[in-house]
Amino acid sequence: MRWKLLILSLLISVALNGQEKGCIPTVPEPPFKAGERIDLGLFYKWGAVNTEVAQAAITLDSLQFNGQDAWHLNFNVKSATFFDVFFKMREDFHSWMTMDGIRPLRFTRNTLEGKYTATNDYNYDWEEMVIHADVNFYNRGMEHYEIPLHPCVYDLPAMIFYLRTMDLSKMKPGDRYPLSFAIDEAVFDIILTYQGAEPLKVRKLGYRNALLFSCSVVSGAMFEGNQELKFWLSDDGAYVPLAIMAPLRVGSVWAWLKDYQP
């Protein structure tokens, strides 16, 4: 499995109850503001092995995008210095989205994973319901795609912050919601399940009240077998990512909150 799929998976999850619901219910005012920063540590765990292999930072600012107020997100991942010797990894994602409704407007991706490189440049066309995507793979060169768009499609950074605008008062444990995210030339469909509230011991930060979600991939071969990702958001109205767990064939990868600056 490529690290890109792991990184994509690490920050995704949420929900359906008997019959399939629509997009996740959201609140009109988001719980975040410009200047926010979230720092995460990525750890590989297998038996007694529990090693930090990368760091991730998510920053948020506001700007004007084609004449409208918009959010700008940057999600950056860098492998630890010692790990660079074995596998150098750099992930740089940027997402522009509307302040009203968290609708994605543009997305860029620049990836280095060992010898593998890739770039994405998306422009969302909500009138024609299509993503105009320019994708450059290390072994294929630049290619253009027209990716079908629907209201529940997001890129990775936009999806993270869209989930944080959920209206928890309209959700209950067991509810499931279909959600889709676009990367490269494809759209991946997932089912997000709200599992409920529980205390969580966060690495080096102690116990926090948390909301648990799980994620099942329903199309796109990101994992072999029926494996579920899990993630925990802070149960304080800000819904900050506290931890994410992605199972692997051997061991698992965890992302733990290290620092949060509102």
Task: List where the protein language model places each region.
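Active-site/ligand-binding surface loops and adjacent short beta/alpha elements
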Residues: 126-183
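Acidic, serine/threonine-rich low-complexity disordered tracts
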Residues: 20-126, 168-262
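Sec-dependent N-terminal signal peptides
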Residues: 4-14
